[in-house]
């Protein structure tokens, strides 16, 4: 491709790594088309008070994990800090553990960007392995990743060719998104406040340094959790001795946790898991998996 913009800035939030994996897929695809790419974690920008230098990018991208059919609170907090976009071309992508309702309406994210002067021309859902409720089987995890690679390449080509692709949002889906998102924001604070560490905690401090909202502290030799949690699950799944657990909603935690890159690179794991013949819960995944 020739004549397309060459500098891309991708700003993303990733709790347990799935949105980062999609970000890496998109960054690689842009680079294959001759673009220069910066991929920047928004939680690191927020924690370190780093200003957004949007003027250096021809195109800006924003990625987030779906929380209760919407972007998490920390993502919207970041959007409020953006400089004026001056009608900059923008794309949005989101990762979800299920294709149900396309991960919710994009109206609220699109509106927040529009108010800052950014024009959203492309939106995409990427279904990735779930990080709550159900531990997907390795073949499905690999199939979802490979599908994300294919969809990522298509998204990048459409962006560079100025082919618009916006998610169709119904009034119902937008209402559901707004309602569930409000409940999730409250629930996240409750969930975080009620985390605790078991006796296997070795006070390594990884959870403290990794927390995107500085919700975890060490006080008098003990790990303490507060009420700024964004429900990303990062502390639970990145704890080396698996010492962090919720007092309530324990059924949300997947055991054992999966290593995405290890599964993807394992040649013994096949990726042909869901087909048109699939029945049961995962049947509704087939339409997503068969789309470009």
What are these regions (language model features)?
Residues 2-8, 16-22, 27-42, 50-64, ...:
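FMN-binding flavodoxin-like domain, especially the glycine-rich phosphate-binding loop
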Residues 8-13, 197:
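Local sequence-structure signature of Cys/Sec-based thiol-disulfide redox active-site neighborhoods
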Residues 46:
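Conserved active-site "lid/cap" helical segment
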Residues 193:
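Short beta-strand or tight-loop elements
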Residues 196-197, 202-224, 230, 234-251:
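Iron-sulfur cluster-binding cysteine motifs and their immediate structural context
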